[in-house]
Amino acid sequence: KDALPFTVIPEFIHNGTLIVDDIEDNSDLRRGKPVLHKLFGVDIAVNAGNAIYFLPYVAIRDSKLPAEAKSKAYDIISSQMLKCHLGQAIDIYWHSGQAERIPTEEEYLQMCANKSGSLACIAAKLGAHIGGGTESQIEALGNFGETVGVVFQIQDDILNISENQSI
């Protein structure tokens, strides 16, 4: 029950990244419906996506966590969000046609770990931290979350180039 206010944090972050990603990809639809920037304009969508990134900090600030636990939660979110945006930047660079070569498998997997692995890592690490896990448990669950995110990103990339959307 005490952890309930924190369960929305990964969803806030994920939805913010989806808004921004839709703009960067110039998508028309998300989950079968028009994307935010097509409905309200890029300026409103960028502002909304960015604003959503800060909602987790408000949830933590307003929580009953001790100051040290709040600081650790802020660090988990900040460090992983930086990785997320680095991964997205690399993905944009590769898709822009500016890259001089095809990325290696290792480079691709690192991009996946940064871009999507970091989001799942936030959920796993934050849950372990708020649940009272040890540092080794927090790291182990973070690594597990990152791996889940990598697998998700690989599947998403396959779906983006596949005609068979049921893969």
Q: Which residue stretches match the model-derived regions?
A:
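Mg2+-dependent prenyl diphosphate-binding active-site environment of isoprenoid biosynthetic enzymes
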Residues: 1-167
